[in-house]
Amino acid sequence: MKQILDFIPLIIFFALYKMYDIYTATGALIIATAIQLVVTYALYKKVEKMQLITFIMVTVFGGMTIFLHDDNFIKWKVTIVYCVFAAGLIIAHILGKPVIKGMLGKEVTLPDDKWAKINHAWVLFFTVCAIANLYVAFEMPLDVWVNFKVFGLLGLTFLYTLFTGMYVYKHMPKEKKEEQE
């Protein structure tokens, strides 16, 4: 259920962009993301930091997009969010508080060096996505960027999550693998 909630604002953004324009879609994205936060809190009594950061960025950059009638701001939002996530993972790693281990460590047991590799891999992933977004956003037509944002980055994230899961499974202790099967 929670994963479905995460995609609703993006689906609304895409649909309204195709029906109207980037400004209508951006306004709807802001509203849908706010509703998503409220619903998430109502259902789970908690809002994750990533959701909160995304909401703040959507509101700030989306607001500037609408207010200044300049779609460059919403394009920059994607890159900045990815950079914030990458920086957050780096800082957490330096401080000895690995975020990904914190998210998955309750269900999955891995050696610390494997958690560090996963962390570094996600830093690299977020950095590559940020750079790719910059290229597509500012070198391609708006339609291409919207499709890339909705389908390209989402697809890449899904694949990377799948590869991460495969890596985790490969390095799980044998007794944990047997429990999973």
Curated annotation (Swiss-Prot):
Keywords: Cell inner membrane, Cell membrane, Membrane, Transmembrane, Transmembrane helix. The chain crosses the membrane at residues 22-42, 50-70, 80-100, 122-142, 148-168. It is a multi-pass membrane protein. This is Inner membrane-spanning protein YciB. The lineage of its organism: Bacteria, Pseudomonadati, Pseudomonadota, Gammaproteobacteria, Vibrionales. Belongs to the YciB family. The keyword Transmembrane helix applies. Its main location: membrane. Pfam families: IspA. Plays a role in cell envelope biogenesis, maintenance of cell envelope integrity and membrane homeostasis. It comes from the Bacteria. NCBIfam families: ispZ (TIGR00997), PRK00259.1-2 (NF001324), PRK00259.1-3 (NF001325). InterPro entries: YciB. It is found in: Cell inner membrane. GO terms for cellular component: plasma membrane.
